[in-house]
Amino acid sequence: MLGVRGSTSAPGADFVRYGGHTSCIAITPEGSDRPTLVLDAGTGLRSLTTVLDGAAFDGSIILSHLHWDRMQGLPFFAAGDRDRARVDLYLPAQDDRSGRDLLAQSFSPPSFPITPEGLRGAWTFCALADGRHEVEGLAVTAIDIEHKGGRTFGLRVEDAQGSLAYLPDHAPAAGLSSELLAVLADVDVLVHDAQFLESERPLAVNFGHATVLDSVKLARACRAGTLVLFHHSPARTDDALDDIAAWVPELARDLPVVVAREGMTLDVVRH
């Protein structure tokens, strides 16, 4: 996990142990020695260059939606801005616009000095529809989920070894469709929005996010093997996240729950 925050990064001494970068996770498939699929390109994406130890990135990036905290790492992803790099970037399709044009909304002057064409390496920009796809040899299912301010996908990624669902921005209190529960059914690892607490529910509703309790309820409903609490509030300090880690097992009972940390590695295997 390269970035576990939501909305904006969280610098400072109170945010060191869990990390301050915005959302980005890198997936290394069975048989590979390096990540080939990245979910979201928050500020944590910059750290992937260090993980790759000087090598150019050769793989795909899928954005769950187009809010700034999902894209701010792209302009500073050195491993993707190299002559030997290959990057297939998938953005949620909307308004019949091309993937390139969707990216250029924030990745072009005056917002940024260059346009998508200014990136070195072999980049493709793909408008991703909902449904099942094959990306980097992995089965990827994209499904529309409730969130505020533009089309947002929940993603399920799986191979023969196991399955991971990624819903970093989700308002489950707005309703859970039978289609979503079917996509998430029996997932091995559920990475889910847990930005707010029950005492902050009005904020969760207003901004289109979830509470920790929402995440636990969804994990139970879809029979997830492990729940990973993700998309931490930029105001949630290390000590506050430690507190959540201390009380959430009683709430979750027999459901294993992990509080996401920057730099954390998870093995995704069948449960």
Residue ranges and their predicted role:
Residues 1-165, 175, 241-271:
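Binuclear metal-dependent hydrolase catalytic cores
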Residues 167-169:
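DG-centered beta-turn motif at the end of beta-strands
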Residues 171-262:
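Cap/insert and terminal regions of metallo-dependent hydrolase folds
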